[in-house]
Amino acid sequence: PETQKSKLDSSRLFQQIFLCCSITGTLLLGFALGITLHFSISTFQTQLDDMLKTTALSLADSAMVREAYHQGYCTDEMIHYFDTLVDTADNMDVLTLSDCNLIRLYHVNHALIGEEFVGGDQGDALAGKSYFSDAIGTLGLQHRFLTPVRGTDGSILGFITVSATMTCIN
C-alpha cells in the first residue's frame, strides 16, 4: 500500500510538473510569436512608408514631372513611365499627379485623368508640406504620402500622392 501510494503521488507530481511546463511553454511560445509579429508588422510599415515617401519625393523633384505641370498634361511617354512604375513597385497601388486646382494630370485609372482629386487631405501639400495620410480615394481606403511639386522658382505647381490601398496592406 505504501509503495502504491508513493507511485500514485509520483504520478500526480509528474502530471503537475508536466502541466506546468506545458502551460509555461505555450505562454512563452505565444509571447515570442507576438513579439515576432509585432516586429514584422513594424518593419513592413517602415519599408512601405520609406517606399511611398522616396517615390513621391523623387518624382516631385523630377524635371519630367515639372514639365507635365507646365504643359497641363502628361505625355503618352510620361503616362507609360508612371504606369510601369506602379506596375513594378511592390505595394504601390496608386500614383496621382494633381495641380493646384485639384485636377489630376495622371492617375493609375486613366479614365480619372482630368477629374478632381478625391480624399480631401491635400491642403497641407498645397501649403508646401510633405506628409503621410490615411484617406478614402477613388480606389478605397489608402495609406498615402503627399508632397508638393515646386517649380524652379519655388512656387507650388501641384502635388503628388503615392498610395498603398489598405487591401494591399492587410
Annotate each language-model stretch with its function:
Residues S62-E116:
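Extracytoplasmic/periplasmic helical hairpin
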Residues T75, L139-Q142, T161-N170:
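Helix-start (N-cap) segments at beta->loop->alpha junctions
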Residues K7-H38:
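Extreme N-terminal signal-anchor transmembrane helix of membrane signaling/transducer proteins, especially
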